[in-house]
């Protein structure tokens, strides 16, 4: 939540609460009312994230099948002064749909990068509305694997894809 949005909600909520208290005291006579407000200021966790490049090496286009060329997508997440251990992760990037899955887009038509959870090779959601909860002591391990659209004839050449990792409190 951004600071501006929270401030607006607090001011509106406090205004409604004050008006309600004023109208009740006017109807019931003059009585003092104690009011206790608790406000939680939500700030992003103080984490640092260091990513790395995933090198797939030389690939044979006909062997790109969503299994071959799987590589660890290593990163370092450090949240030493975090207020809580329960966090959530979001991966953002340009995506496309290949064979029914949302994958990272590359600069080669018909080629994408599938991001997987290393624990079971399941698809790791990529997108603005996809958050994955985790505990700082058990961070998700990711893998990247090239995928080819059914029937695609991949052009030879280097390819690129990138993603951004966002970490926040649950």
Swiss-Prot record:
<keyword id="KW-0732">Signal</keyword>
<dbReference type="InterPro" id="IPR036937">
    <property type="entry name" value="Adhesion_dom_fimbrial_sf"/>
</dbReference>
<comment type="similarity">
    <text>Belongs to the fimbrial protein family.</text>
</comment>
<feature type="signal peptide">
    <location>
        <begin position="1"/>
        <end position="28"/>
    </location>
</feature>
<dbReference type="InterPro" id="IPR050263">
    <property type="entry name" value="Bact_Fimbrial_Adh_Pro"/>
</dbReference>
<dbReference type="InterPro" id="IPR008966">
    <property type="entry name" value="Adhesion_dom_sf"/>
</dbReference>
<dbReference type="Pfam" id="PF00419">
    <property type="entry name" value="Fimbrial"/>
</dbReference>
<comment type="function">
    <text>Part of the yfcOPQRSUV fimbrial operon. Could contribute to adhesion to various surfaces in specific environmental niches. Increases adhesion to eukaryotic T24 bladder epithelial cells in the absence of fim genes.</text>
</comment>
<dbReference type="GO" id="GO:0043709">
    <property type="term" value="P:cell adhesion involved in single-species biofilm formation"/>
</dbReference>
<protein>
    <recommendedName>
        <fullName>Uncharacterized fimbrial-like protein YfcR</fullName>
    </recommendedName>
</protein>
<dbReference type="InterPro" id="IPR000259">
    <property type="entry name" value="Adhesion_dom_fimbrial"/>
</dbReference>
<dbReference type="GO" id="GO:0009289">
    <property type="term" value="C:pilus"/>
</dbReference>
<dbReference type="GO" id="GO:0007155">
    <property type="term" value="P:cell adhesion"/>
</dbReference>
